[in-house]
């Protein structure tokens, strides 16, 4: 799946609120940096953490709460 499609699906999960999505991605990236395991099987070996977090949100594996 292309990154544009992943971003569109992730935006859909947060009711098209770009600010909320960026905050959720940042929080998940921090969790990954601090040792959390990815919730998805990585489709390519050297994915960036922001790509992993966005894909997890798009797949519905990370729930995003309103701020």
From Swiss-Prot:
Its EC number is 2.7.7.6. GO terms for cellular component: DNA-directed RNA polymerase complex. Coiled coil: none annotated. SUPFAM superfamilies: RPB6/omega subunit-like. It catalyses: RNA(n) + a ribonucleoside 5'-triphosphate = RNA(n+1) + diphosphate. Keywords: DNA-directed RNA polymerase, Nucleotidyltransferase, Transcription, Transferase. GO terms for molecular function: DNA binding; DNA-directed RNA polymerase activity. One of its GO terms (biological process) is DNA-templated transcription. It comes from the Bacteria. Pfam families: RNA_pol_Rpb6. The keyword Lipid metabolism does not apply. It is an enzyme of class 2 (transferase). The RNAP catalytic core consists of 2 alpha, 1 beta, 1 beta' and 1 omega subunit. When a sigma factor is associated with the core the holoenzyme is formed, which can initiate transcription. Promotes RNA polymerase assembly. Latches the N- and C-terminal regions of the beta' subunit thereby facilitating its interaction with the beta and alpha subunits. Belongs to the RNA polymerase subunit omega family. NCBIfam families: PRK00392.6-2 (NF001579). This is DNA-directed RNA polymerase subunit omega.
């Amino acid at each position: 799946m292309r990154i544009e499609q992943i971003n569109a699906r992730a935006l859909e999960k947060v009711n098209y609120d770009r600010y909320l999505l960026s905050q959720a991605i940042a929080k998940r990236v921090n969790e990954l940096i601090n040792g959390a395991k990815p919730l998805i099987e990585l489709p390519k070996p050297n994915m960036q953490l922001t790509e992993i977090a966005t894909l997890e949100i798009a797949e519905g594996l990370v729930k995003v709460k309103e701020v």
